[in-house]
C-alpha cells in the first residue's frame, strides 16, 4: 500500500497542487496495475478450486480498485479545474488590459469634449457680441435714414456687393454631383475597420483643405498621428490610415515628395499588419500610383497599379466593379506611355465588368465606352470609335424616351438625316426637328455632352459638316458643362493626325479616385479607392478633389484684378463657378499667382494647341 500523504501546514500554490496531483495520478496508476495483476489469477477460470481466503482477498482487491479509480477521477477533475482557472485568469488579464485602454480613451475623449465645450462657449460669446453689434448697426442705420443731411458717402455702401455680383455669376446652376463610381471603400477592408473618430477627423481635414486652410489641416493631421503613435505604436493600421490622410493633403498642395514618403510608410505598415494581399494595401498602392502619375512617372506607377489590380482580383474576384476601376487606371497609365494595344485590352475588360455587374445604364459604362473610343481614335480605328459614340447616344436616348423607332430617333440619326437632306433645303430646320431629345442632356451625365462633341468632330473629319454642326449645336445648348472646349480641341487634333499616332502629349498628372471610399476612400483610403477617369481625350483627370474650388477661386481672382484695373474685357461667366463665401476667401485668391499655364493645377492640364481654353477650364471632369 502507498504511504498516506499528510497535508502541509503552509498554503500550496496552484503549480504545486498541479505537480502533486500529477504525481498522485502516476502513483495511483501504478497501484491500479499492481492490483489488477493480483486480481487476475484469482478470477481466472483455470484457477480451479479456490484456495482458502481467496474470496476475501478478491473482494478486498476489488474495493481497492474502486477506490483507486475514484482517486484517479478526482485527480483528473482537479487538473481540469486548474486548467479552467488558468483560462479564467488569462481572460481576466485581457479584460483588465481592455479596461485600461478604454479608460485612456475615455480620458482622451473627455479632454476633447472639454476643449470642444470651451470652443463652443467662445463661439456663443462671439455670436452674442456680433448680434449686439448687428443690432447697434441697425439702429445707426435707422438714425441715418432719418437724417435729412446724410452724407453722400453713405450711398456707396452697396458698391462692394454690386461689384461682387458683377464678378460672380448667379448660383442657379449647381455643380454636378460626384461620380457614382467613387463610392466609399473605407469600410471594405477585410477584417480591419477604420475607427469612427478617424472618419470624423478625415471629414474635418477635408473641410479645412477644401477651404484652403492647410495651415489648420496639416497640424491637425500631425497631432492626431503623434497621438496614435503614442497610444498604439507606429506599426498599427490606424497610423497607416492617418498617414494616408496626411499624404492626400500634401498631394493637394503639390508636395509630392512628402506625400510619396508618407504613402510608402503607410504601405509598409499595412503590409506588415494586414498582409500583402489586403484590400487596404491595394488602395495604398493605387494612391501611390496616382501620385507617381501626377509627377509624370508613368513607368514607376504602372507596376504599382498592376499589383493593386492583382490584389483586388484575388480578394474581390475578376468581375468586381473595383477591379474595373483599377483596370481603367491601368489603361490610362498605359495610354500615357503609348501602349495602345494594352489600353484597348484593359478598357475592354473594364467595360465588360461594368456592363455585366452594374448594367448597361450605369454611368461608368458610357464613360468607359467614351475612353475606349478615344483609344480607337489614337489607333486610327475611326469606324469603331463612331460605333461606340453612337451606342452611348442611343442608350441615353432609350433611357429617357424609350426604344428607337421611326418617330423616336436618337440625335445622331437626326444629324445624319440632316446631312443627307442638306441639298434639298436651303434653310436649316428648326431645333424642334430633333424631337425633345436635346432635353436629355440636362438630366444625363457630362459623358453625353462629351460624346456629342467627339462624334461631331469625327463627322467633321469625314466631311459631314451639317451632321457635325447638328451635334455641336445640341451640345452647346446643354446648360450643364459636359466637356470643355479644350477636350474637343484634343479630339479634333487626334482626328487631324489621320494615322493615329501613339506618341501622346504629356497628359495631366491629376488622377483621382472613384468609390470611397472617394473615398479614401476613399476616407481610406480613405479610401476611396482613387479612380482615374478619362474625358474621352486620353488625358488623366482627377475627380473628387479640391481642384474645382481652386480653379474657381483662381479665375475669380483674375477677374477681380481685371475689374479693379479697368479696361480689360471680362470673361463670360462660368455657370459652375460658385460665389466666394467671404472677402477673406477672395483676398486669399487674389494673392495667389494667376499666370495662365503656370503653377498649381494649371500645370496638370494636357499640353495642346488649345492652351487658352485649358487655362479657363472650371473643373477636372471624372
From Swiss-Prot:
It holds the Pfam family TPR_10. One of its GO terms (cellular component) is nucleoplasm. Signal peptide: none annotated. Residues 180-190 have a biased composition (Gly residues). It is a peripheral membrane protein. SUPFAM superfamilies: TPR-like. Keywords: Coiled coil, Cytoplasm, Cytoskeleton, Hereditary spastic paraplegia, Lysosome, Membrane, Microtubule, Motor protein, Neurodegeneration, Neuropathy, Phosphoprotein, Repeat, TPR repeat. Residues 78-143 form a coiled coil. It is found in: Cytoplasm, Cytoskeleton; Lysosome membrane. TPR repeats lie at residues 198-231, 240-273, 282-315, 324-357, 366-399, 449-482. The modification Phosphoserine is found at residues 151, 175, 179, 445, 508, 521, 581-582, 589, 608, 610, 615. Residues 538-547, 601-622 have a biased composition (Low complexity). Residues 145-164, 493-509 have a biased composition (Basic and acidic residues). Oligomeric complex composed of two heavy chains and two light chains. Interacts (via TPR repeats) with PLEKHM2. It is linked to Spastic paraplegia, optic atrophy, and neuropathy: A form of spastic paraplegia, a neurodegenerative disorder characterized by a slow, gradual, progressive weakness and spasticity of the lower limbs. Rate of progression and the severity of symptoms are quite variable. Initial symptoms may include difficulty with balance, weakness and stiffness in the legs, muscle spasms, and dragging the toes when walking. In some forms of the disorder, bladder symptoms (such as incontinence) may appear, or the weakness and stiffness may spread to other parts of the body. PANTHER family: KINESIN LIGHT CHAIN, KINESIN LIGHT CHAIN 2. This is Kinesin light chain 2.
